[in-house]
């Protein structure tokens, strides 16, 4: 195989920190700039209106942008292994929730789980379309500023850089909250594991899936 000599012809200034800075669009995406849009099934009946839903988005302090997984199929051939594409796999999606004093979100997830299978007798809704719902995680960008004019952000809304719509979610686990006399300077939080059928990704324009 011939050596590509073009790799030796890259100017030194293309390897500089300034060159790297110019390619780091918007200063890079930040893992602490995100929000989760909630959509509980109507049968759960937890939120009174969209304003309350929007308010409680702030209580979700941890989430993930989903992985893209394709299983491999190994086909043996004369002592070698041919690896071909298998089936898609979608990992469970875990979020971390801050537990505020009214237990609103914990109640919502406990009701959702109870809506699927009741803790008392094992009955529940049998139609998946009634307990599936679509959740969304938004990667946010940093708001643009114009210090010369206002000294403040040019807009109150952080831009959405990427949006992932998690399809057919339902909670398979709502974690325990540990209690202890020794714990100080801490607010309760808990994790929820949501099973996902598939996901779709959208760019900032939100005009169609980018995948």
Q: What do these predicted ranges mean?
A:
Residues 1-211:
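Glycine-rich, low-complexity intrinsically disordered segments
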